[in-house]
Amino acid sequence: MKRTIIMMLDSFGVGASADAASFGDVGSDTFGHIAKACAEGKADIGREGPLKLPNLARLGLGHAAMESTGAFAPGFGDNVELIGAYGHAQELSSGKDTPSGHWEMAGVPVLFEWGYFSEHQNSFPKELTDKILARAGLDGFLGNCHASGTTILEELGEEHMRSGKPIFYTSADSVFQIACHEETFGLDNLYRLCEITREELEPYNIGRVIARPFDGTGPSDFARTGNRKDYSLEPPAKTVLDKLKEAGGEVVSVGKIADIYAYCGITKKVKANGLEALFDATLAEVKSAGDNTIVFTNFVDFDSHYGHRRDVAGYAKGLEYFDARLPEMLALLGEDDLLILTADHGCDPTWQGTDHTREYVPVLAFGAGLKAGSLGRRKSFADIGQSIASHFKLEPMAYGESFL
């Protein structure tokens, strides 16, 4: 029985990539800087001491990062019995955003330029927002700027609840984000507003519209809920997910995977929110998955809760939780199963600002006859998609080289 399990640690980069200068990210290193902060006692909130990831280390994380940066991260070294194949991958796509990383790892790099709202204030064209408001029957909106999703709730959440005006904001990514209170504005109303916005954005080539529902009564307790929804463009070509589905296989999305691929190539969607629930759901799906199945999980908390919020201790604690549960996953794997752990970009919690960082990502692979050892530097995330195509004996992808 052949299956592939992809555990995507959203934003878990392993060092600045060769083209990081083009993104202002030279010196960024999500994994390395977290390990350094832990070793120096600077990440002892909710946890303490050096970063402890023994299971990821056995799968080759420390070695993959060493090959990426030229040095082992603090607390990691050669004194580990490797069981997995490890490498690090360069992104071929033009951006450091979520859709680009995900589509590329499924065999379809983004070789065009996304549209962006680059102005930090008055970010959106009036012509665009006028059309959105008219179609939605709204008399105004708040925000219209680059912002941290949590900060903008503190600043504008109460005014939003009083006025009923949605909060529009963006970032360095190709994204249009809309924050609304689940009770006073309504979740269905927010989703409908996002659908309208997605349609009106067609000429702008924006990668995603994101619904950002929140609850609470004031700045001290406003919090995003688990009902986020992404409205992505469809990938520009068939991914390996599409090809497996067309061949009669199953593709199970856990978390936000289905949204990122605009449901293309997905046969089942499982909703889960938070690291624990995402891990539980992944294990449950692997237990029930049959032959020719991909189980694909995005562990979004690493990015949304820790990377963007520049929470080093939280990121470290999350990694240690994930690592402690990995043996549960390994115990479920059959001889012909392929387990892949990777990331879609970096989001160094020690870096300036709140945006993603252009980094190499780890490629940790286990099973399917792979021998423990180095896979080297992969020229594209698409090597993952090509390897999955090879694993299932599908038609080769146009991009990528298999490491199987």
From Swiss-Prot:
Similarity remark: Belongs to the phosphopentomutase family.
Catalyses which reaction(s): 2-deoxy-alpha-D-ribose 1-phosphate = 2-deoxy-D-ribose 5-phosphate; alpha-D-ribose 1-phosphate = D-ribose 5-phosphate
Co-factor note (free text): Binds 2 manganese ions.
Protein name (record): Phosphopentomutase
One BP annotation, GO: 2-deoxyribose 1-phosphate catabolic process
Amino-acid positions noted as binding Mn(2+) 2 in the UniProt annotation, renumbered to this chain: D303, H308, H356
Localization annotation: Cytoplasm
Cofactor(s) listed: Mn(2+)
Keyword tags: Cytoplasm, Isomerase, Manganese, Metal-binding
Broad class of enzyme this protein falls into: isomerase
Job of this protein: Isomerase that catalyzes the conversion of deoxy-ribose 1-phosphate (dRib-1-P) and ribose 1-phosphate (Rib-1-P) to deoxy-ribose 5-phosphate (dRib-5-P) and ribose 5-phosphate (Rib-5-P), respectively.
InterPro entries: Alkaline_phosphatase_core_sf, DeoB, Metalloenzyme, Phosphopentomutase_DeoB_cap_sf
GO cellular component: cytosol
Source organism of the structure: Shewanella baltica (strain OS185)
